[in-house]
């Protein structure tokens, strides 16, 4: 059973990664209306080879991979619930994974049938990364990563725990601003990075405001992440799980900044934009894992005593 769970959890992560990629691809290529206003089929029927368009194919494939991923997520949640029922985080994570998967699908359906609001569609991406993060956490528990890094002896102080919780919430909000950039079609609102002609110019449109707000949010995220990394290496260097996680998070945020800048300089190159979406999804999942470790800190302290 354990071997099956390991293989299944990896396959589920791969499936959900494809879903995240697919959602970003739908947005980047303007394929959201590729299947008309019917759901789950395309214009009320299966796609026929005689009338396939790139937009229709992308949208239909996204719906199909979402359906397949739903099966993987539900099976993983049920098996983890049964096999790891003695772990206190298992049931909440399984519920979150399935619940947010359903919400994500319903929001996608609503956007197709009743039209798309950029602010709601930006939240659609936010829902998907919560589902993704919960699946990653279940997989890490299945692979017993805690034992490999001796995380069971990890004790965090209040300052670090609060910073990790707050940073994770803030990262989610920063992700929302990035998704809003895509859905408001503001990617090239300010075509020079970080500012136009090297200096700040007052925005004069909604797209300008959205783009500037995202860049400021991203800058704050980088600074905050550097601060938390400094805290970890100053006070918690003996815990490999923390130092490794923070180094990995710095790598993710550096790649995120680079792909963000390149997105502007390349006129929103499709592959760079997709990488930009995937990297922040993985960073959010990593921060959620740190939140999981922080939530165990008190019980670890009591057990060690």
From Swiss-Prot:
<feature type="transmembrane region" description="Helical">
    <location>
        <begin position="213"/>
        <end position="233"/>
    </location>
</feature>
<keyword id="KW-0350">Heme biosynthesis</keyword>
<feature type="transmembrane region" description="Helical">
    <location>
        <begin position="241"/>
        <end position="261"/>
    </location>
</feature>
<keyword id="KW-1015">Disulfide bond</keyword>
<feature type="transmembrane region" description="Helical">
    <location>
        <begin position="64"/>
        <end position="84"/>
    </location>
</feature>
<keyword id="KW-0812">Transmembrane</keyword>
<feature type="topological domain" description="Extracellular">
    <location>
        <begin position="182"/>
        <end position="212"/>
    </location>
</feature>
<feature type="topological domain" description="Cytoplasmic">
    <location>
        <begin position="293"/>
        <end position="305"/>
    </location>
</feature>
<dbReference type="InterPro" id="IPR050450">
    <property type="entry name" value="COX15/CtaA_HemeA_synthase"/>
</dbReference>
<keyword id="KW-0408">Iron</keyword>
<keyword id="KW-0472">Membrane</keyword>
<dbReference type="InterPro" id="IPR023755">
    <property type="entry name" value="HemeA_Synthase_type1"/>
</dbReference>
<feature type="topological domain" description="Cytoplasmic">
    <location>
        <begin position="144"/>
        <end position="160"/>
    </location>
</feature>
<feature type="binding site" description="axial binding residue">
    <location>
        <position position="276"/>
    </location>
    <ligand>
        <name>heme b</name>
    </ligand>
</feature>
<comment type="pathway">
    <text>Porphyrin-containing compound metabolism; heme A biosynthesis; heme A from heme O: step 1/1.</text>
</comment>
<keyword id="KW-0560">Oxidoreductase</keyword>
<keyword id="KW-1133">Transmembrane helix</keyword>
<feature type="transmembrane region" description="Helical">
    <location>
        <begin position="123"/>
        <end position="143"/>
    </location>
</feature>
<feature type="topological domain" description="Extracellular">
    <location>
        <begin position="114"/>
        <end position="122"/>
    </location>
</feature>
<comment type="function">
    <text>Catalyzes the conversion of heme O to heme A by two successive hydroxylations of the methyl group at C8. The first hydroxylation forms heme I, the second hydroxylation results in an unstable dihydroxymethyl group, which spontaneously dehydrates, resulting in the formyl group of heme A.</text>
</comment>
<feature type="transmembrane region" description="Helical">
    <location>
        <begin position="272"/>
        <end position="292"/>
    </location>
</feature>
<dbReference type="Pfam" id="PF02628">
    <property type="entry name" value="COX15-CtaA"/>
</dbReference>
<comment type="similarity">
    <text>Belongs to the COX15/CtaA family. Type 1 subfamily.</text>
</comment>
<dbReference type="InterPro" id="IPR003780">
    <property type="entry name" value="COX15/CtaA_fam"/>
</dbReference>
<feature type="topological domain" description="Cytoplasmic">
    <location>
        <begin position="234"/>
        <end position="240"/>
    </location>
</feature>
<feature type="transmembrane region" description="Helical">
    <location>
        <begin position="93"/>
        <end position="113"/>
    </location>
</feature>
<dbReference type="GO" id="GO:0016653">
    <property type="term" value="F:oxidoreductase activity, acting on NAD(P)H, heme protein as acceptor"/>
</dbReference>
<feature type="topological domain" description="Cytoplasmic">
    <location>
        <begin position="1"/>
        <end position="6"/>
    </location>
</feature>
<feature type="active site">
    <location>
        <position position="59"/>
    </location>
</feature>
<comment type="subunit">
    <text>Interacts with CtaB.</text>
</comment>
<feature type="topological domain" description="Extracellular">
    <location>
        <begin position="28"/>
        <end position="63"/>
    </location>
</feature>
<feature type="topological domain" description="Cytoplasmic">
    <location>
        <begin position="85"/>
        <end position="92"/>
    </location>
</feature>
<dbReference type="GO" id="GO:0006784">
    <property type="term" value="P:heme A biosynthetic process"/>
</dbReference>
<feature type="disulfide bond" description="Essential for catalytic activity">
    <location>
        <begin position="35"/>
        <end position="42"/>
    </location>
</feature>
<feature type="transmembrane region" description="Helical">
    <location>
        <begin position="161"/>
        <end position="181"/>
    </location>
</feature>
<feature type="transmembrane region" description="Helical">
    <location>
        <begin position="7"/>
        <end position="27"/>
    </location>
</feature>
<protein>
    <recommendedName>
        <fullName>Heme A synthase</fullName>
        <ecNumber>1.17.99.9</ecNumber>
    </recommendedName>
</protein>
<dbReference type="GO" id="GO:0046872">
    <property type="term" value="F:metal ion binding"/>
</dbReference>
<keyword id="KW-1003">Cell membrane</keyword>
<feature type="binding site" description="axial binding residue">
    <location>
        <position position="124"/>
    </location>
    <ligand>
        <name>heme o</name>
    </ligand>
</feature>
<feature type="binding site" description="axial binding residue">
    <location>
        <position position="214"/>
    </location>
    <ligand>
        <name>heme b</name>
    </ligand>
</feature>
<feature type="binding site" description="axial binding residue">
    <location>
        <position position="62"/>
    </location>
    <ligand>
        <name>heme o</name>
    </ligand>
</feature>
């Amino acid at each position: 059973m354990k071997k099956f769970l390991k293989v299944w959890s990896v396959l589920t992560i791969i499936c959900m990664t494809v879903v995240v990629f697919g959602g970003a691809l739908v947005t980047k290529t303007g394929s959201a209306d590729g299947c008309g206003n019917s759901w789950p089929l395309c214009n009320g029927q299966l796609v026929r080879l005689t009338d396939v368009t790139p937009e229709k194919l992308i949208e239909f494939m996204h719906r199909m991979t979402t359906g397949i991923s739903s099966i993987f997520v539900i099976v993983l949640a049920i098996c983890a619930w049964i096999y790891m029922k003695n772990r206190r985080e298992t049931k909440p994570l399984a519920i979150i994974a399935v619940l947010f998967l359903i919400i994500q699908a319903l929001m996608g359906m609503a956007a197709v049938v009743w039209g798309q609001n950029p602010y709601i569609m930006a939240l659609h991406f936010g829902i998907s990364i919560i589902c993704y993060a919960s699946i990653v956490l279940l997989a890490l528990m299945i692979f017993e990563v805690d034992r490999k890094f001796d995380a069971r002896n990890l004790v965090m102080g209040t300052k670090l725990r609060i910073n990790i919780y707050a940073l994770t919430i803030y990262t989610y909000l920063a992700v929302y601003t990035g998704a809003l950039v895509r859905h408001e079609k503001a990617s090239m609102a300010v075509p020079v990075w970080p500012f136009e002609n090297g200096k700040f110019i007052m925005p004069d449109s909604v797209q300008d405001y959205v783009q500037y707000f995202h860049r400021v949010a991203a800058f704050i995220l980088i600074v905050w992440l550097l601060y938390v990394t400094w805290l970890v290496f100053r006070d918690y260097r003996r815990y490999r799980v923390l130092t490794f996680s923070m180094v990995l998070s710095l790598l993710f945020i550096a790649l995120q900044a680079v792909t963000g800048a390149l997105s502007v300089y390349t006129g929103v190159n499709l592959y760079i934009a997709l990488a930009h979406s995937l990297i922040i999804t993985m960073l959010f999942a990593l921060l959620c894992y740190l939140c999981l470790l922080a939530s165990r800190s008190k019980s670890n302290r009591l057990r060690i005593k």
